Design a protein with these regions (language model features):
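Preference for intrinsically disordered or flexible, low-complexity segments
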Residues: 1-226
């Protein structure tokens, strides 16, 4: 049965069971392949990183028939992600926030199709894994509140980002939706190793997502690594 999580903060875990919350990797659930974002530098299809459904949060944050899919321009050559493409995705200090407008990642709000599609070389796709959520325990909450600038360092939904470099301050239009820790994903699937430069991916969603149309940008995604 597909249900929303309860109130409070949750860790993101990888599971074999589809609970209707979303998935890492795989293709994209696009009803129109023309919506698939292309890398502005190379013209090649971007890589789907994660898809989140409207059930991911305790309250409705998306229209009922929509999902958010995060795409990123990551070059994967011989199993190693090109450092140049990772640097384009990295926002390590506030002065680099202009990278968010350069189009090397896209948080796409779209209707969910009946099946996945793939544009380009399917061999480039990440392995598909379903998303699960586990409520924070007392230890997790203590870690979340311990530092003045950063929250807990696991993959999680909501809360505060755990910054690996400088804190990044976003426009009030966007809120922190989730962070994804590469090391946790890599322990489940070695194909994720190096995806974020051994770092973390940060997803910020548009406060207005419930009012936006189909096939539009509805947030920002970037990474930090040390």
């Amino acid at each position: 049965m597909q249900t929303r999580p309860g109130p409070g903060l949750h860790k993101i875990v990888v599971t074999d069971q589809d609970g209707g919350l979303g998935q890492f990797g795989g293709g994209a659930w696009l009803h129109d392949a023309a919506l698939w974002p292309m890398d502005p530098s190379t013209g090649r299809p971007m890589l789907p990183i994660v898809m989140l459904t409207g059930l991911f949060l305790p309250t409705a944050y998306l229209p009922d028939d929509r999902v958010l899919t995060v795409f990123a321009s990551i070059e994967r050559s011989g199993g190693v992600d090109g450092r140049s493409s990772l640097r384009r995705l990295a926002v390590n200090q506030q002065g680099e926030s202009d990278k968010l407008a350069q189009g090397h990642s896209k948080v796409l709000l779209h209707r969910r199709a009946a099946q996945e599609v793939c544009v380009g070389d399917s061999a480039r796709l990440l392995g598909r894994h379903f998303i699960g959520l586990q409520p924070f325990d007392d230890h997790d909450m203590a870690e979340e509140l311990e530092d003045e600038d950063s929250g807990a360092g696991m993959s999680k939904q909501l809360g505060r980002p755990c910054w690996l470099q400088d804190p990044i301050y976003m426009s009030p239009r966007y809120y922190f939706l989730a962070q994804f820790v590469e090391a946790e994903l890599g322990r489940v699937d070695s194909g994720y190793a190096g995806l974020f430069g051994d770092g973390t991916g940060y997803l910020f969603a548009d406060q207005r997502a419930r009012k936006l149309g189909d096939g539009v940008a509805a947030g920002h995604f970037f990474i930090q690594f040390t």
